C-alpha cells in the first residue's frame, strides 16, 4: 500500500493544482487566443517539454509521457508513479504600432498518475488544461473630425482535459497505447462598438458557450536494439477527428454611456441554449530517436494538424494546417552512482512551429528553446524537475509575443507492491 505521507502529498498537490487551474482563468492577455479553441497548451510532461517537446519515442520507467500513450508500457512493474507540474510565465506583447504590454502569471500544467496492471499492460490517468482563452483588443476608428468610435474584442475561458490511457506490449520491443480524453470548459466571446458621443447608441454582442466532448489518441512505439551501443526508436501518434459539442447563448445589448455609467436600452436573445458541433482536426505525429536507457536520448519529432478543417456548424474559422518540428534529448551521467551529481538528468531541446493561425495573409509562427534539470532525492527515484523556456510567437507586422517560462514539477516513484521480507 502507499505510505500515508504520499497520500497526503498527492492530496495536497491535487488541491494546489486545482486552485491554480481556477486562477488560470485570469490568464495573460493573448490576442491570438481569440481564434479557434483558444491558445492550445503544450500538453507535454515536464520531462518531454524540457527536450523541446520531443517525446513520441521517449520511454521511462519513472516518468509519465502522455505525448504517446504507448510509452506507458515502460512503467516500473512494482511502482506507483505520480507527476505534477506548474509554470511561471512572463511575457511581453509588442504591436506593429510600437505599443507594448507586459505581464506574468502562474499556470497549472498537469497532474498525472501511472501504474502497472500486468507486465504487458500499464495504465495512466490525469488532468491538464487543453486550451486557454483570454484576450482584449481595442480598435479605434474615426469617421470625421469629431466623430470617433472604438471596436473592442474581449473574451475569456478555457477547456480542461481529463484523460485515461492504457498501453499494451503486443510483442517484444513493440507497444500500442490509447488515450481517451474528456474535454469540458467554457468560452465567453464579446464584441462592442462604442461611440465617443455620449448620446449615441452603443452595442455589445456576447456569446457564451459550454463545451463538452471527447478525443481519442492512439500511439505505437518500436525499438530496434543495436548490439550493446543503444537502440533506435520509432514512434507514431494519431488523434482522430471526433466532433465535440457546445451549448451556447448569445445576447445583443444596446446601451448609452460606457463602463459602470452605462444605461441599458434594450437586450435581445437571438440564440438560447443552441447546440453547436465543432469539427475537430486530424493530428498525426511521428518520431525517430537514438539512445540508451537511463543514459542518453536524442530524438526528433514532426507533428501535422489538419486545422484547416476546423469548423463550428460547418462555418470555418479561417484556420490553416499546423506543422511542428522538435528536436531534443537528455543525458544522465550515471543513474546508479552513489554520488549525487552523476544521478542528475540534463535536458536540452528546441522547436519551430507554423501554427494554425494565418492573419491578414501573415502566418503566425512560434519557436522556442528549452533547458531542463532533474534532481533525484537520495536513495530514491522520486525527485524534482526544473525546465526553462524562451520563445517567440507572432510577427512584428501584427503582434509579437516574447515569453519566458519556468516550469517546476514533482515526480513521485513509490514501490507499493513489494513485499517485506521476514527474518
Give the predicted meaning of each segment.
Residues 25-423:
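Subset of outer-membrane beta-barrel
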Residues 1-29, 423:
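Bacterial Sec-dependent N-terminal signal peptides
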Amino acid at each position: 500500500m502507499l505510505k500515508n505521507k504520499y497520500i497526503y502529498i498527492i492530496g495536497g498537490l491535487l488541491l494546489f493544482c486545482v486552485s491554480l487551474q481556477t486562477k488560470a482563468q485570469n490568464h495573460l492577455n493573448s490576442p491570438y487566443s481569440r481564434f479557434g479553441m483558444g491558445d492550445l497548451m503544450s500538453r507535454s510532461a515536464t520531462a518531454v517539454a524540457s527536450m523541446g517537446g520531443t517525446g513520441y519515442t521517449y520511454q521511462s520507467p519513472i516518468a509519465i509521457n502522455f505525448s504517446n500513450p504507448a510509452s506507458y508500457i515502460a512503467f516500473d512493474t512494482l511502482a506507483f508513479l505520480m507527476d505534477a507540474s506548474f509554470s511561471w510565465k512572463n511575457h511581453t506583447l509588442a504591436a506593429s504600432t510600437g505599443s507594448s504590454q507586459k505581464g506574468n502569471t502562474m499556470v497549472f500544467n498537469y497532474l498525472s498518475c501511472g501504474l502497472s496492471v500486468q507486465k504487458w499492460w500499464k495504465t495512466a490517468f490525469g488532468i491538464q488544461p487543453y486550451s486557454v482563452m483570454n484576450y482584449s483588443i481595442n480598435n479605434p476608428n474615426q469617421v470625421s473630425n469629431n466623430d470617433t468610435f472604438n471596436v473592442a474584442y474581449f473574451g475569456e475561458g478555457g477547456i480542461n482535459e481529463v484523460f485515461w490511457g492504457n498501453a499494451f506490449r503486443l510483442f517484444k520491443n513493440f507497444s500500442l497505447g490509447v488515450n481517451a480524453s474528456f474535454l469540458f470548459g467554457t468560452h465567453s466571446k464579446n464584441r462592442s462598438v462604442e461611440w465617443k458621443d455620449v448620446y449615441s447608441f452603443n452595442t455589445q454582442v456576447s456569446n457564451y458557450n459550454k463545451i463538452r466532448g471527447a478525443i481519442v489518441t492512439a500511439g505505437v512505439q518500436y525499438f530496434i536494439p543495436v548490439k550493446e551501443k543503444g537502440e533506435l526508436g520509432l514512434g507514431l501518434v494519431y488523434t482522430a477527428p471526433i466532433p465535440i459539442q457546445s451549448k451556447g447563448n448569445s445576447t445583443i445589448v444596446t446601451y448609452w454611456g460606457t463602463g459602470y455609467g452605462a444605461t441599458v436600452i434594450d437586450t435581445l436573445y437571438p440564440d438560447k441554449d443552441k447546440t453547436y458541433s465543432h469539427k475537430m482536426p486530424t493530428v498525426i505525429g511521428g518520431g525517430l530517436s537514438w539512445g540508451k536507457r537511463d543514459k542518453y536520448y536524442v530524438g526528433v519529432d514532426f507533428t501535422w494538424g489538419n486545422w484547416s478543417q476546423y469548423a463550428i456548424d460547418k462555418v470555418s474559422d479561417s484556420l490553416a494546417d499546423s506543422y511542428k518540428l522538435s528536436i531534443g534529448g537528455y543525458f544522465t551521467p550515471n543513474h546508479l552512482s552513489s554520488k549525487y551529481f552523476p544521478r542528475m538528468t540534463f535536458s536540452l531541446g528546441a522547436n519551430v512551429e507554423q501554427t494554425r493561425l494565418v492573419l491578414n495573409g501573415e502566418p503566425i509562427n512560434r519557436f522556442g528553446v528549452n533547458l531542463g534539470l532533474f534532481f533525484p532525492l537520495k536513495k530514491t527515484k522520486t525527485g524534482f524537475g526544473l525546465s526553462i523556456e524562451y520563445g517567440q510567437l507572432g510577427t512584428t507586422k501584427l503582434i509579437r509575443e516574447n515569453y519566458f517560462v519556468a516550469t517546476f514539477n514533482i515526480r513521485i516513484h513509490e514501490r507499493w507492491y513489494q513485499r517485506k521480507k521476514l527474518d
